[in-house]
Amino acid sequence: MIERGKFRSLTLINWNGFFARTFDLDELVTTLSGGNGAGKSTTMAAFVTALIPDLTLLHFRNTTEAGATSGSRDKGLHGKLKAGVCYSMLDTINSRHQRVVVGVRLQQVAGRDRKVDIKPFAIQGLPMSVQPTQLVTETLNERQARVLPLNELKDKLEAMEGVQFKQFNSITDYHSLMFDLGIIARRLRSASDRSKFYRLIEASLYGGISSAITRSLRDYLLPENSGVRKAFQDMEAALRENRMTLEAIRVTQSDRDLFKHLISEATNYVAADYMRHANERRVHLDKALEFRRELHTSRQQLAAEQYKHVDMARELAEHNGAEGDLEADYQAASDHLNLVQTALRQQEKIERYEADLDELQVRLEEQNEVVAEAIERQEENEARAEAAELEVDELKSQLADYQQALDVQQTRAIQYNQAIAALNRAKELCHLPDLTADSAAEWLETFQAKELEATEKMLSLEQKMSMAQTAHSQFEQAYQLVVAINGPLARNEAWDVARELLREGVDQRHLAEQVQPLRMRLSELEQRLREQQEAERLLADFCKRQGKNFDIDELEALHQELEARIASLSDSVSNAREERMALRQEQEQLQSRIQSLMQRAPVWLAAQNSLNQLSEQCGEAFSSSQDVTEYLQQLLEREREAIVERDEVGARKNAVDEEIERLSQPGGSEDQRLNALAERFGGVLLSEIYDDVSLEDAPYFSALYGPSRHAIVVPDLSQVTEHLEGLTDCPEDLYLIEGDPQSFDDSVFSVDELEKAVVVKIADRQWRYSRFPEVPLFGRAARESRIESLHAEREVLSERFATLSFDVQKTQRLHQAFSRFIGSHLAVAFESDPEAEIRQLNSRRVELERALSNHENDNQQQRIQFEQAKEGVTALNRILPRLNLLADDSLADRVDEIRERLDEAQEAARFVQQFGNQLAKLEPIVSVLQSDPEQFEQLKEDYAYSQQMQRDARQQAFALTEVVQRRAHFSYSDSAEMLSGNSDLNEKLRERLEQAEAERTRAREALRGHAAQLSQYNQVLASLKSSYDTKKELLNDLQRELQDIGVRADSGAEERARIRRDELHAQLSNNRSRRNQLEKALTFCEAEMDNLTRKLRKLERDYFEMREQVVTAKAGWCAVMRMVKDNGVERRLHRRELAYLSADDLRSMSDKALGALRLAVADNEHLRDVLRLSEDPKRPERKIQFFVAVYQHLRERIRQDIIRTDDPVEAIEQMEIELSRLTEELTSREQKLAISSRSVANIIRKTIQREQNRIRMLNQGLQNVSFGQVNSVRLNVNVRETHAMLLDVLSEQHEQHQDLFNSNRLTFSEALAKLYQRLNPQIDMGQRTPQTIGEELLDYRNYLEMEVEVNRGSDGWLRAESGALSTGEAIGTGMSILVMVVQSWEDESRRLRGKDISPCRLLFLDEAARLDARSIATLFELCERLQMQLIIAAPENISPEKGTTYKLVRKVFQNTEHVHVVGLRGFTPQLPETLPGTVDAPSEAS
């Protein structure tokens, strides 16, 4: 037998009066005895706090607060604690012999609110030897100890092996652990559960009959049947969803016609406009292409006219240009004639001026020689004067320096500085950087010798110059003549050049004599050359017009070829007319054939659409009508097979549903009559008794009872006999077993268990052998397992049945579609594609149009070729007479050759004319050029150089002389020697100064005299040069003017210029006549071009307007196409058969659909607004938006749980198939889901009966409880009259109220509430909804009334009320009720915790002095019988004979208050035994 868990001890740490106190709790009753304020309530408060650490519930009031609505601010807990860390711990041991210490850490929180902080914790695995006080205290010395904080306690326990410490952040987790370990009787999941538990403890603590508990005994004693409520909620949710789906199906069925109408009209409205725009776009494109072709043709014509105009304009421009050139040439020829005449006169002037210049040239040369000699003498005089000046200046400077240095103080310094300066100047002039004062004398001799040598060389050159002066004048005259003829040259080349010039003069005079014959020859050749150029121009013009270059030899053959071409082209033009008529006739035939095919195309397209739909639906491709009929036969066979299979699956599914319904009956009864019989006999079904049997034991018990597994267990078979008489409404075999349903077991049979079977010995001569069933159905677990497998099978069958039903209906609709196709489209569906033939014919029509266009172009080209041939013949007639000139290729070369020879002759004539006189003068004196007389100029340069060298040598010698003279200054001698030396030097300087000044005077006078003579020579030379330059300038001007005239002024030039002018005049007249002809032709051509330009402008305007319209429409069309493709509606809108309707027909179709749509969407604001916007003809994309909006609207209306598609059209097609199947299936499902009212009544009655039996069993434990005059206590459970009436109506008269339960608008709960109101109209339901009332009526607890009754004295059984009982009787009665509640909780929670745990039972009783000794003994007896622990607080006069008693005395010692505790086990005559662990712990350290 499982031992019940017990509370071992209660430990208080740092409570008021208890520093570290452990109370060992008795297994039955623990009594706390003591006077007022001894600490009894504090001890119980510590126990309750550790048990329920919820500050929202804890409230420890005393008797002074009885009847108060609120207690003290701290609710009695803050004042029971001391400052610092406090603990309250419960040491327990459960049924598994596990020691568990649970408790709380408490600590006062500073503040006026007097709050307390609580932290619950639990300790597991603590050794039995460790006391709780040892855990939370630390001994400091013999008289002092310290309380450990919670974190130190945690660390201390973690260090102990095998000990687990848990700290909880929520009370729910704390209580969950206590429930799992068997410390409390009920799982406290919520604050409401904790409140019930606390109210129970509070009622126990303060005693009496608690109104809070007696008013809600149903909540304390009757378990909530959550499974039944959840089953009803799930059923109602399933029914609600089922009904919503059925309602959606009905709405969908009602909307189906609207869907069809809306889709049909929206498709007609949008598709007609869509195809009309597509047709218009194609028409506009065709028109634009036609305009472009006409524009291209007109442009070609205009281009041809422009080419013609350009040719004529070019020819006219050529003639205009030629006319201008001819006019210019004519004017130039006239001007040339005038220029020739002017040049002849100019040539005469030039000859006169040349003679004058020759004379001036001779005089100028003579005067130049005189001036040159004067200049040389002038330069010599200037050099001597300059040297004299320099010498005087140097001497004066030296003399001045000498005078300045006479100062005694500065003489040596000045002389030394002068010496240094002279030495530096000598170094610089002599280029001797190493010169010193000592070596100056040696260098002076060297430089004096250089000065003497330079003077001698200069005098020698001066003598040579005077001798070469005479020879130089003749050489210069001849040299100047050579320079004048040849230009600048070296003097040593003058002899060779002069001889070459004389020989060239002879040749030039010979060439000058041939000028006249060459001119005459050139004039004749130039005339022939002009005629040849004219012929070449005509030939080039002809070749350009023909587009090909021709040789001269080919011209005659070309002339004959062109004449033959003219004849052939005239014949081709006549044949082209007949060919054009044949092409036009074929074009008309093609057009008529295309029209007939376009009429047949819509019918064929409709047949193809139907055929394609059939192919998509069946996944087959049909190539002939025979394939269609064969597939139809296969379809019929497949339909028959599917129907047979569907019926088979449906039958199996119904069988599974029936079995599930049978197994789902409450109590395991497969026959509803058994429930009624069990209720009638006052018994219980055997299957209900074994309802909790496990799945593993189910086969055994099913075989054990065999056919009697559906028996009814009754308390007494003799009482059933009268009910069996005349019983007809029962199964064929009805088994009745006598036994107590509350304590029934299987001992009624003698059983031998075999392998997977049992042998039941029913009687001595009757045995039954039963094997274990493969699928046991005995017990709720076995039935649930079977139901679960059946549900899985039913899901598979339902899915298969739905698939087969869908396939059957789909096949039937496919069969109907094939039948419609055969009746309507089979005749035309497999004919050839008319659109493909139309495309071929259109291609042929385009080819014919192209052929006609090419034919017109060829005819036009032939006419052009005819005109070109005629022009070519005309041109050849002009060219052929001049073929000889064209063949003369050397004519131009001969002209160039004669022209070159003439140019050479004329150049020679000009040379003779220009240099003839100079050559005549040069010839007598040319021999002097053989040798240059000592090269006079070089001699002059050498003379000037020698003068400069002589001057430099003189200066260098003077500088060295000065250094030598100043050598004394470099050595500082005594003053006497320097004075005498200075005196000599002064005298020498003065003498040299006088001589130098005399020399300077003579040089100045000679310079002035010679300068005056040089000025006279220069004046004469300037006069001659001025006259020569003037004449030369005039001659040059005349020559430039003659050159500017650019003509050769010979004797025949004037006659040639006159002939040239007359020829150009004749050419100009011919050119003007041709230009007038071209201007007239050009005027006609421009008029034709103007007409073509106007036509072209109109065509361009029409084309661009059409193109702009096409481009604009294309942008909108692109947006439309993009929208169509993005939304996937192209297949719906692009109806090819509409392409063959006219725009008016399509517009009429769209307008009709628009009228229908306005009515259809009148109630839909969104679609109405979108439809109104779509009526704008300029915004075709809005119609697409409307179509998409319609599709979106329909998609939203489609229930995706019914139709698995987003396409409304496909949804409508599937809707016909799916709706009927879903309606049938959902109706059947609703019938299966809906539980009958009789079943509900039976479930509630069974539950009430079960709970009544349980309460009856609880009452048995209270039969012998007595307190004072109270002899017994019991709970009375009755069914309310109003609810009993409801159950009777549900089970017996439910047919009268089927209007409520069969209504689709009401759930079962609402129907139940309506029935309750109908049966009890006098009851006010308040503001509660029918759903809320119905849910309450589904809870069996609301059907019961519970009250506590006591058997008191002579009054018998009466209702237990505080006013009718004494205080002791009320306390005892209340305690009995609390024991019943605890036991009920244990029974309810047994299935939630481990089966090997029996929870602790403990109650409190404060102020037990109100009970007499007999009542206290009754409590002891009750505790012993129920294995319950009790803690009693009583004054000192209470002395129970059993249990453990603690004497509590509160003492004050040295301002320290503590409670002295002595524990005694029972009261007997013997000496009291002191209990271990009752000695007070050391007092708290001060």
UniProtKB/Swiss-Prot annotation:
Protein's name according to its UniProt entry: Chromosome partition protein MukB
GO BP: cell division; chromosome condensation; chromosome segregation; DNA replication
UniProt subunit comment: Homodimerization via its hinge domain. Binds to DNA via its C-terminal region. Interacts, and probably forms a ternary complex, with MukE and MukF via its C-terminal region. The complex formation is stimulated by calcium or magnesium. Interacts with tubulin-related protein FtsZ.
Ligand binding (ATP): 34-41
InterPro entries tied to this protein: MukB (IPR012090), MukB/SMC (IPR050308), MukB_hinge (IPR032520), MukB_hinge_sf (IPR042501), MukB_N_dom (IPR007406), P-loop_NTPase (IPR027417)
Domain notes from UniProt: The hinge domain, which separates the large intramolecular coiled coil regions, allows the homodimerization, forming a V-shaped homodimer.
Source organism: Escherichia fergusonii (strain ATCC 35469 / DSM 13698 / CCUG 18766 / IAM 14443 / JCM 21226 / LMG 7866 / NBRC 102419 / NCTC 12128 / CDC 0568-73)
Encoding gene, per UniProt annotation: mukB
Keyword GTP-binding: no
Keyword hit for Lipid metabolism: no
One GO molecular-function entry: DNA binding
Swiss-Prot/TrEMBL keywords: ATP-binding, Cell cycle, Cell division, Chromosome partition, Coiled coil, Cytoplasm, DNA condensation, DNA-binding, Nucleotide-binding
An annotated GO cellular component: nucleoid
SUPFAM superfamilies, sorted: P-loop containing nucleoside triphosphate hydrolases
UniProt cross-references to HAMAP family, sorted A to Z: MukB
Stretches the record annotates as Flexible hinge: 666-783
Task of the protein: Plays a central role in chromosome condensation, segregation and cell cycle progression. Functions as a homodimer, which is essential for chromosome partition. Involved in negative DNA supercoiling in vivo, and by this means organize and compact chromosomes. May achieve or facilitate chromosome segregation by condensation DNA from both sides of a centrally located replisome during cell division.
Family: Belongs to the SMC family. MukB subfamily.
Compartments where located: Cytoplasm, Nucleoid
Superkingdom: Bacteria
Coiled coil: 326-418, 444-480, 509-603, 835-923, 977-1115, 1209-1266
Pfam families: MukB (PF04310), MukB_hinge (PF16330), SbcC_Walker_B (PF13558)
